[in-house]
């Protein structure tokens, strides 16, 4: 399997999470077509991937509501019809409904979102291992 990892990062936590996810998938024998910010994406990286992983950070105040940062950038990604996708978000306090909203945005691109995980910024190592393990377990093996 091949994966493309796309992210939006402000402080570097989401970038680090994307890099750790890619490294964990490589340990499972997956190929990685890219690990890159969404704004620097090359279309070929999505075309070559079997699974597109989209990650961002949680934006907003705990009392007002949280949302995935950069939803506009996600909405402008190329169509992903026929692609499997997984999502992740990094957070400090509480992700709220960020992951659900991220799943919805990626689904609108035509991807079949098979899951996601909210990753606490102080537990990136263990949470990214869990993310990769869940992804490997839930992606159908190609014939």
Where are each of the predicted segments found?
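Extreme N-terminal starter segment of soluble prokaryotic enzymes
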Residues: 1-4
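Short hydrophobic segments within beta-strands
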Residues: 6-8, 88
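FMN-binding flavodoxin-like domain, especially the glycine-rich phosphate-binding loop
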Residues: 13-16, 24-35, 45-143
